[in-house]
Amino acid sequence: MNNLLLNCDIGESFGAWRMGLDAEVMPLIDCANIACGFHAGDPGTMRRTVALAVEHGVRIGAHPGYPDLVGFGRRSLACSAQEVEDLLLYQIGALDGLCRAQGTRVRYVKPHGALYQDMMRDPAILAAVLRALAAYDRTLPLMLMSTRDNTAARALGEAHGIELWFEAFADRAYDGAGYLVSRSQPGAVHHDAETVLAQALLLARGAALRASDGSALALEAQTLCVHGDNPASLAAVRRIRDALEAA
């Protein structure tokens, strides 16, 4: 069984609004994708989430998104390549500053929501993200979605000198090309803990999933995305962690 790192989007509260069970999920994961204030999060939330990650020895990743608090970063914005670079540099730098104040640093980058999806489907946006990482710190890996064919993404990563960490999702359905089924479609998100655990174990074993079109889908992955938004999803994360450690 592959030794997949568990990553989770975290630090997504904002002001008086609370999102996720951060304190409960942090001890169960390897990598924390911390929101950087544009789609969610604020300076205080970011600083507290960094401290929580340090306490539990969890790697810290910047989780930048489009400037869209109302839409939680799930709506695409018509940004130029230069604007995408600027958005990435601003958000990575903000989180890294809060990290350095606590004796640590950002270790990787994973874009959020619509920016993540746009990056996966538009090579120009992916190239802009890679240029931002190269400009800020060429040693930072980029976490991105594993699909049926990672050849083009891998070539762009190599061209920019950026390491890629391919990820798969335990609680999402995939289409035939290996992309995530849109959240607007029925069955796009798995809510049943047994289904989430079964998919996580298939991915850890390198076995094929069943895509929404019925085809077999094999995904290359170094890390597995999980969510701890509610008690049910938290229970699924705990079961995945236990299963991976027992394997």
Curated annotation (Swiss-Prot):
Top EC group: hydrolase
An annotated Gene Ontology molecular function: 5-oxoprolinase (ATP-hydrolyzing) activity
InterPro entries: Glyco_hydro/deAcase_b/a-brl (IPR011330), LamB/YcsF/PxpA-like (IPR005501)
SUPFAM superfamilies: Glycoside hydrolase/deacetylase
Catalyses which reaction(s): 5-oxo-L-proline + ATP + 2 H2O = L-glutamate + ADP + phosphate + H(+)
Keyword Methyltransferase carried by entry: no
Keywords: ATP-binding, Hydrolase, Nucleotide-binding
EC number: 3.5.2.9
Database matches in CDD domains: LamB_YcsF_like
Gene3D superfamilies given in the database record: Glycoside hydrolase/deacetylase (3.20.20.370)
Biological process per Gene Ontology, one example term: carbohydrate metabolic process
Family listed: Belongs to the LamB/PxpA family.
Self-association and partners: Forms a complex composed of PxpA, PxpB and PxpC.
HAMAP family: PxpA
Function: Catalyzes the cleavage of 5-oxoproline to form L-glutamate coupled to the hydrolysis of ATP to ADP and inorganic phosphate.
Protein's name according to its UniProt entry: 5-oxoprolinase subunit A 2
Gene (name only): pxpA2
